[in-house]
Design a protein with these regions (language model features):
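Hydrophobic/aromatic-rich transmembrane helices and adjacent perimembrane loops
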Residues: 114-121, 236, 285, 291-298, ...
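Membrane-interface alpha helices of multi-pass inner-membrane proteins
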Residues: 26-32, 317-334, 344
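Transmembrane alpha-helical segments
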Residues: 160, 331, 335-337, 516-557
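Hydrophobic, aromatic-rich transmembrane alpha-helices
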Residues: 1-3, 131-134, 250, 347-351, ...
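Membrane-embedded, hydrophobic transmembrane alpha-helices
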Residues: 1-144, 374-385, 390-397, 460, ...
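Active-site lumenal/periplasmic loops and adjacent helix-entry segments of GT-C-fold
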Residues: 146-147, 156-293, 297, 539-558
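Short periplasmic/luminal acceptor-recognition loop of GT-C membrane glycosyltransferases, typified by
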Residues: 559-627, 645, 649-666
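Membrane-interface helix-loop-helix junctions at transmembrane boundaries of multi-pass membrane enzymes
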Residues: 138-146, 252-260, 313-314, 355-361, ...
């Protein structure tokens, strides 16, 4: 029972986090119907928290708060010389899957096209998942032994939090998301229209997540700036919580060597910086974003809570699972896709083990994400998705012919199956841990859940299925996130534990445990370290090939040139001004202030969300964007300097900022009348910025 006393504080932190997120979701989606005042929303938040607290006290048994994960039991005998054919077979299956995945990524598999091989992989994963579900029938026998350093998770969490705080990895997505928190913090109202390009002048789609608005409400009430709250205060806290969530998730899966597993997982997350969409990049360097916290913390918590509920059948565990689902729903619109899918798998396992009635209770977790998806997001990508569309959006599901008629081209499975395999050795790593992680999850329930999620992942990426999902939900641009159905970090930790416990073996009787332990661990480390790229050097995904970097002390996660430009803008810009600057500066400008507005930080997003008025200005804004950028974007129309004066006038640009070394461009805009307050600010490590206001 040492585990119960040692990690209970972390479990309490997680329970408080889930409670706060659940109340935030309930508050945001209910208050949207009757108020936009941040102070009123804060009051509703307090009332909802009190009511939910009372309900939890009423319907849970004693000890719900901070209740530890029950001591795990093993489905496989850890004895070194016990004949374990299952462990041997899974070991070889993982090795063969890793080789096959790597050959697929290298495009050296014969006969079939890459798309056909991708479809073959999906079929093989589906078949393997069915076998994995059936093989999870081993009898529960031996209690696990947790004689380890019980505060180790706190040390890992502190280290990861430090790295996340010191990593400067600004995000263009903050243009859309942190901007909302900043608007609420500065203006005290929940936005219902555009706040990036105007003071709620342009039409825009309402935000489907509660994460950003509730951070804004908290910032407004506490009088802390939203960027400081999110970039400086929240980052280390959220990163530490995500480590606790991984630890709890692995304990829920009955991973025997959780501390060793945390070491391997943390190393992977620190070196997973090659891919823009990687687990490592989301886990820490982007943790302030709702979708990042969702994949880093809430998915492990949701899976872990579901496994425990399926195993125990206790009311406390069901309520915790439902609370996690509600809290996760408010983080990101991605949750409206994935939470129902996770729930479907958990409900299937619960029904298999405990009957239809228990599965029905489990399915309640779908209600929140389905409601949010229908009422705040819609069922069609071109829909304005405003509130009040719940009825027609629901009726759309009763008209499958209408939805199917919109399908014009099936997605390519090759695009999605290989998307996360960058670097290429990660394809082998992910295939390996899907097998070895199943083995290292020493619980029949956990193995069934893992098998179910793998099966669902394979089904979702079958082209006709994915096409229907994209048509119904309008998520084509983010359907790559169905990869999150596979909890790779948790599976990696379970695989590491399988190595440490002697389950990885070449023969059914593991007579050389130390040798197999060394070789298996070395293989995992090779797949992590050889292609590894520290997340603090990860690419920002931009044309100029900028990368993240370390900074100290921790500060706002903004792009280079921002502080130089803002030093001038704080003096010469007036409230409501439209400012033209380099794209990266506009990204950070829109995230950190709503006093002024950028011209065009998100190029292709602008005409989609600003309505007819915005579309009429689009080409003018593109012209201005091409001029303020030192390097031309080849995907946009080429710059026409003759059209520039008219574009500046029609858009109403009040201030222009240019790189200080662009003498010819500065000279040109001066002829347009941009001379008032002109000055240059240049830091020792920056390009320098020249800004001036139009003389009127």
């Amino acid at each position: 029972m040492a585990l119960i006393g040692s990690r209970r504080l972390a479990d309490k932190v997680l329970d408080v986090t889930v409670f706060i997120l659940a109340t935030a979701s309930l508050t945001y989606y209910s208050s949207r119907y009757f108020t936009t005042s941040a102070l009123v929303v804060a009051g509703v938040w307090v009332v909802v928290a009190l009511l939910l607290f009372i309900l939890i006290r009423r319907f849970t048994e004693v000890g719900f708060y901070g209740e530890p994960v029950p001591a795990p039991y093993l489905t496989s005998d850890p004895s070194l010389y016990r004949n374990n054919a299952l462990a041997r077979n899974v070991t070889w299956a993982g090795l063969l899957a890793a080789v096959f995945a790597y050959l697929y990524i290298e495009n050296v598999l014969p006969n079939l096209s890459p798309s056909q091989w991708a479809l073959t992989i999906l079929v093989l994963v589906a078949i393997g998942s069915v076998f994995a579900f059936r093989l999870a029938k081993a009898q529960v026998e031996v209690a696990a032994d947790y004689k380890t350093f019980h505060w180790f998770a706190w040390l890992i969490a502190a280290g990861k939090a430090l790295v996340a705080s010191a990593t400067l990895r600004p995000q263009s997505d903050d243009t859309n998301y942190v901007n909302i928190s900043t608007w609420i913090a500065e203006r005290g109202t929940i936005s219902i229209r555009d706040t990036v390009y105007s003071d709620q002048v342009f039409d825009t789609k309402p935000l489907g997540s509660a994460w950003e608005p509730m951070w804004g409400v908290f910032a407004h009430v506490t009088n802390i700036s939203a960027p400081t709250l999110l970039y400086v205060i929240a980052v280390p806290i959220l990163t530490a919580i995500s480590i606790f969530a991984l630890d709890r998730g692995m304990r829920s899966m009955h991973v025997r060597h959780t501390n060793f597993a945390l070491i391997i997982v943390s190393l992977f997350l620190l070196l997973d910086g090659e891919n823009l969409f990687s687990f490592g990049v989301f886990h820490g360097p982007r943790i302030w974003q709702g979708k990042a916290f969702f994949v880093s913390a809430m998915i492990p918590l949701l899976i872990g809570a579901g496994i425990i509920w399926a195993r125990s059948g206790r009311r406390n565990d069901l309520i915790r699972f439902l609370l996690v689902a509600i809290g996760a729903t408010g983080l990101t619109t991605t949750a409206t896709m994935l939470v129902p899918m996770f729930t479907l798998v958990i409900a299937g396992v619960v029904g298999y083990q405990r009957g239809i009635k228990a599965a029905g209770w489990t399915s309640l977790a779908m209600l929140a994400p389905l409601y949010v998806g229908l009422a705040f997001r819609g069922t069609r990508s071109e829909d304005s998705n405003a509130m009040g569309h719940l009825a027609p959006d629901t009726l759309a599901f009763a008209q499958p012919a209408t939805l199917l008629s919109g399908l014009s081209e099936l997605p390519d499975p090759n695009e999605f199956v290989r998307l996360m395999a960058e670097p290429k050795l990660h394809a082998a790593l992910f295939a390996l841990v899907m097998c070895w992680g199943w083995l290292g999850s020493e619980s029949r329930t956990a193995r069934r859940v893992i098998a179910g999620m793998s099966l669902l992942w394979a089904i979702v990426y079958v082209p006709p299925v994915l096409a229907v999902i994209e048509e119904v939900t309008g998520v084509a641009q983010i359907s790559w996130r169905f990869w999150w159905l596979l909890p790779i970090p948790m599976l990696l930790g379970a695989a590491a534990s399988a190595c440490a416990s002697g389950l990885i073996r070449i023969t059914s009787i593991n007579r050389h445990k130390n040798l197999t332990l060394g070789l298996a661990t070395a293989l995992l480390l090779a797949f992590i370290v050889i292609p590894g790229k520290p997340v603090w050097f990860s690419s920002l995904g931009q044309v100029n090939l900028q990368s993240a970097r370390l900074m100290w002390p921790p500060g706002w996660k903004v792009f280079g040139g921002y502080y130089e430009a803002m030093e001038i803008l704080d003096v010469i810009a007036k409230d409501g001004d439209i400012v033209a600057a380099r794209q990266n500066i506009e990204f950070s400008m829109s995230a950190t202030t709503v006093r002024i507005h950028p011209v065009l930080p998100k190029v292709f997003w602008f005409p989609e969300v600003t309505g007819p008025v915005g579309k009429a200005q689009y080409l003018d804004r593109v012209t201005i964007r091409q001029f303020t950028s030192k390097d031309q974007d080849v995907l946009l129309p080429p710059l026409d300097l003759k059209a520039l004066p008219g574009a500046l006038k029609r858009v109403g640009v009040d201030v222009i900022c240019l790189d200080a070394d662009r003498a010819d461009a500065i000279k040109l805009v001066k002829t347009f009348g941009y001379t008032q307050g002109a000055q240059v600010v240049k830091y020792s490590s920056g390009r320098g910025q020249w800004c001036a206001r139009i003389s009127k």
